[in-house]
Each structure stands twice: as C-alpha cells, then as structure tokens.
C-alpha cells in the first residue's frame, strides 16, 4: 500500500528537504498508513537540530516542547506537528526515561531506539519507506516484536510492557515469543511506572475490540495486585 502524506506534514518535510536536511514521517503514522488506517497524528523526524528547525519555520510558529530531547512542535494550518531530531539514548537509570540523549545524523540509529518493529519505520516521498527492522513484514504477519534485544527494550522503559499488549489488542496481532517472554520476565519493573501512565495504557487496552485475550495475568499481577485475590 502506498503512503499518502497528510498535506501539512508533506509541506513541512518538503521544507526540511529543500533546506538540506533529511526528514521523514515516522512511527505510528507510517504504521497506520500501511494498515490502511487514517493516522491521528503525524510525527516527523529529521537530521536538523532543534535550533535549525526553529530558524527554518520561525519562532512564532514553533513551540519548544522538548528541546533537551530534540523535539520542536510546529504549528501549521491550525494543526500541531512534532519534529524530533534523530537521536540515540543513554542509560535508563529510572527504568522510564533516558539519562541523556545524543543527536545523530543517521535515521537508522534513531529507529533502533524505538520499541517495536511496527513503530520503527520512516517514510519520505523522496526515499520511500525506511524499514531496517522488518516492521512491514511484521505488519503483514500480524506480529508485535521488539526492536533488537527485548530485555533491553523493556529494561529501558517498563511501560513498553503494557504497550506491547495494547498494540496487540488494538490490531488483533500475535506477540513474538521472545518479546513476550522478556515482557513477563521484567513485569515487576512496572512498579517504577506512575499509576497515571499505567491507567492510561490500561484504558487504551480495554478499549480494544477483544481486550480479554490480551490481559496477561503474569503482567497484570504487578499492575493490579488485587486481581490475585479476586474471587467470584
């Protein structure tokens, strides 16, 4: 299936390209487009540094939403677009957020830090689909699989464990065996995640067509301990 860029996103990407910066739509918008779904948001990534993005589009149109992580939100035609510089991430001492980030020129390095292969794809009209981890194949197979080493991905950010089941439930996908084994092994790390973020992910999971098939007891035991003692 061809990806049709939303007009505002296409215009921003074109401006970045004309200024000499590699730039792509990335993540969920690419995934949903390949599935034939309408993306809710269009996230963009680029080799341009945050200051260069703000200079290109003008400070009056830019919101410095996360400069330390390379993110600038750009206003265009009444919509907001997050543009993030390609980056790698350091250690996750708190099991939730990186201690540091480093801006890099290579898109593939940026994609390598992402959670699942189906979310680690990028697209531009000039270069087409960039899919170094087989996300498109996993979409076709109906599988959610971690990028790289699953234990590392979940060790970096325990909330990804719930995101694993949420994405599987949303799309009716199977879960890669090694990925699920790592999620169960590190489920206790969910203790480090705030109740608000856990509630948000659980609500999204429960909104899926058949959430019961993905409510994994070994994981929920660390999120909702009361379930261990529930009886009819």
Report each predicted region and the residues it spans.
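Catalytic cores of the polymerase beta-like nucleotidyltransferase superfamily
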Residues: 1-232
């Amino acid at each position: 299936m061809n990806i049709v860029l939303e007009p505002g996103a296409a215009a921003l990407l074109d401006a970045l390209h004309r200024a000499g910066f590699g730039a792509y739509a990335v993540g969920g918008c690419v995934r949903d487009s390949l599935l034939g779904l309408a993306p809710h948001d269009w996230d963009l990534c680029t080799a341009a540094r945050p200051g260069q993005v703000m200079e290109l589009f003008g400070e009056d149109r830019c919101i410095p939403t996360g400069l330390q992580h390379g993110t600038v939100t750009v206003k265009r035609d009444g919509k907001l677009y997050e543009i993030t510089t390609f980056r790698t991430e350091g250690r996750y001492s708190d099991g939730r957020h990186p201690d540091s980030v480093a801006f890099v020129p290579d898109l593939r390095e940026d994609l390598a830090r992402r959670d699942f292969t189906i979310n680690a794809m990028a697209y531009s009209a000039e270069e087409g689909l960039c899919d170094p981890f087989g996300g498109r194949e996993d979409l076709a197979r109906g599988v959610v699989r971690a990028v790289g080493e699953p234990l590392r991905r979940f060790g970096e950010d325990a909330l990804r464990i719930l995101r694993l089941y949420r994405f599987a439930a949303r799309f009716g996908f199977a879960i890669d065996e090694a990925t699920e084994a790592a999620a169960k092994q590190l489920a206790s790390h969910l203790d480090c995640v705030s109740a608000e973020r856990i509630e948000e992910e659980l609500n999204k999971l429960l909104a899926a067509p058949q959430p019961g098939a993905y409510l994994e007891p070994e994981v929920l035991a660390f999120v909702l301990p009361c379930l261990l003692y529930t009886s009819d």
